[in-house]
């Protein structure tokens, strides 16, 4: 699996496609002829692909990345975790390893499952993946109020109804947590701002 530069699509060879579930391959965002994965097919495909990464590779990747960042003077990392590893393995790994790494880490859990955030004791929630309100311009699925200039039938994709985003923002705000959401297109930005307004208005 090779990720697109924008982090919102990927292409798989036939061997990787064979490992993916029917849920991914039957998704409208999956093109089994070309191997391209977009939107929910991409997110679910990445979630399934992470199951094939050995735990020691995760540990080496985290520690090696932290050492490199330290070598170029970076001492604080805002890390977004929760990309589909079984039992949130990446979340547990960063929690265990962070005290021994050369940076301070501020962890954002990429989930709308507020119970899971509370269970891990985090005060920050959000990022991309489960918090992606839309896609991106590179894949032409950033959510817009007006159609794409090169495709008058394409307004992009909103991944959630407004009510669901409001519910998430209100719940997280009640806990006093810091919230981040991925919103690229103007329709998604408006959805995000509307959810923040709902959270602030909540009594």
Kindly label every feature range from the protein language model.
Residues 12, 113-126:
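Carboxylate/His-rich catalytic cores and anion/metal-binding grooves
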Residues 89-95, 117-119, 189-201:
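Distinct, well-ordered alpha-helical segments
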Residues 69, 201-203:
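C-terminal active-site-proximal or functional interface alpha/beta core segments in diverse enzymes
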Residues 101-103, 122, 127, 203:
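A short helix-to-beta-strand connector/capping loop
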């Amino acid at each position: 699996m090779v990720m697109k530069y924008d982090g919102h699509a990927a292409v798989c060879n036939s061997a990787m496609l064979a490992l993916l579930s029917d849920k991914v391959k039957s998704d409208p965002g999956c093109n089994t002829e070309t191997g391209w994965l977009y939107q929910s097919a991409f997110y679910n495909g990445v979630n399934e692909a992470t199951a094939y990464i050995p735990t020691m590779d995760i540990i080496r990747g985290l520690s090696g990345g932290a050492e490199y960042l330290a070598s170029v003077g970076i001492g604080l990392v805002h890390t977004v975790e929760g990309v589909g590893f079984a039992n949130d393995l990446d979340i547990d790994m960063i929690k265990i390893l962070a005290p021994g790494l050369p940076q301070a880490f501020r962890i954002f859990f990429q989930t709308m499952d507020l119970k899971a955030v509370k269970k891990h004791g985090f005060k920050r929630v959000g990022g991309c993946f489960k918090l992606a309100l839309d896609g991106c311009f590179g894949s032409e699925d950033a959510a817009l109020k007006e159609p794409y200039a090169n495709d008058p039938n394409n307004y992009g994709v909103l991944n959630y109804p407004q009510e669901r985003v409001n519910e998430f923002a209100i719940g997280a705000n009640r806990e006093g947590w810091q919230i981040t959401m991925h919103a690229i297109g103007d329709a998604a930005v408006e959805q995000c701002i509307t959810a923040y307004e709902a959270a602030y208005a909540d009594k």
